[in-house]
């Protein structure tokens, strides 16, 4: 599955998403590897088979093996951390903030790529997963490492569009009685 095939499957009511998917992946203040790493992490968070396949296939042209693995790892570890820390953040129980998480997160300390890139990709996944505490932490890290507000906005725009595309494809699949990986838009 290619990005163009994904765009072709979007129904006319999602034309804005079709156009945005092309633009956020090609027009950015980010380096190409940063764009595609953010896209992978967002696709993992969005959980649509075809979106993930298309994004990872295209990203393989822009990232080396270490970058692909690190972007997948960002999506994976944020799948855990975003649930945990969103609960800590939103719970009325102040004790949660005092107790150690006791969850392995070694990949954050040694992602195999530049730390700023991994943090940016984690921010993209956190935006999809809606963890405010994680968004703030990753935003602070990338800003501290020299990224601009525009860089952060571009990563979040990528995440937003990928999430929306996955949502539409899943909804259209549900309406047609198919699973999310085989739907065809009318």
From Swiss-Prot:
What Gene Ontology molecular function terms does this protein carry?
alkyl hydroperoxide reductase activity; disulfide oxidoreductase activity; hydroperoxide reductase activity; peroxiredoxin activity
**Main EC class the enzyme belongs to:** oxidoreductase
Q: Which reaction does it catalyse?
A: N(6)-[(R)-dihydrolipoyl]-L-lysyl-[lipoyl-carrier protein] + a hydroperoxide = N(6)-[(R)-lipoyl]-L-lysyl-[lipoyl-carrier protein] + an alcohol + H2O
Q: Which GO terms describe its biological process?
A: cell redox homeostasis; response to oxidative stress
- Keywords linked to the UniProt accession: Antioxidant, Disulfide bond, Oxidoreductase, Peroxidase, Redox-active center
**UniProt EC number:** 1.11.1.28
Catalytic center at which residues? Answer: 131 (proton donor), 134 (cysteine sulfenic acid (-soh) intermediate)
Q: Which cysteines are joined by disulfide bonds?
A: 131-134
Q: What does this protein do?
A: Antioxidant protein with alkyl hydroperoxidase activity. Required for the reduction of the AhpC active site cysteine residues and for the regeneration of the AhpC enzyme activity.
Q: Which PANTHER family does this one have?
A: ALKYL HYDROPEROXIDE REDUCTASE AHPD (PTHR33930:SF7)
Annotated family: Belongs to the AhpD family.
NCBIfam families associated with the record: ahpD (TIGR00777), ahpD_dom (TIGR00778)
Know the name of this protein?
Alkyl hydroperoxide reductase AhpD
């Amino acid at each position: 599955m290619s990005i163009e095939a994904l765009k072709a499957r979007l129904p006319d009511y999602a034309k804005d998403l079709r156009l945005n998917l092309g633009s956020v992946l090609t027009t950015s203040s980010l380096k190409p590897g940063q764009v595609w790493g953010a896209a992978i992490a967002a696709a993992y968070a969005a959980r649509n088979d075809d979106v993930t396949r298309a994004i990872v296939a295209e990203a393989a042209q822009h990232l080396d093996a270490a970058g692909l693995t690190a972007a997948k790892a960002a999506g994976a570890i944020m799948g855990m951390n975003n649930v945990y820390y969103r609960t800590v953040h939103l719970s009325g129980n102040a004790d949660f903030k005092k107790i150690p998480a006791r969850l392995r997160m070694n990949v954050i300390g040694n992602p195999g790529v530049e730390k700023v890139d991994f943090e940016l990709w984690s921010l993209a996944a956190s935006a999809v997963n809606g963890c405010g505490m994680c968004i703030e932490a990753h935003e602070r890290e990338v800003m501290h490492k020299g990224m601009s507000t525009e860089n952060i906005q571009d990563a979040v725009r990528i995440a937003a569009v990928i999430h929306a595309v996955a949502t539409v494809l899943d909804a259209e699949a549900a309406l047609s009685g198919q699973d999310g990986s085989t739907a065809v838009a009318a």
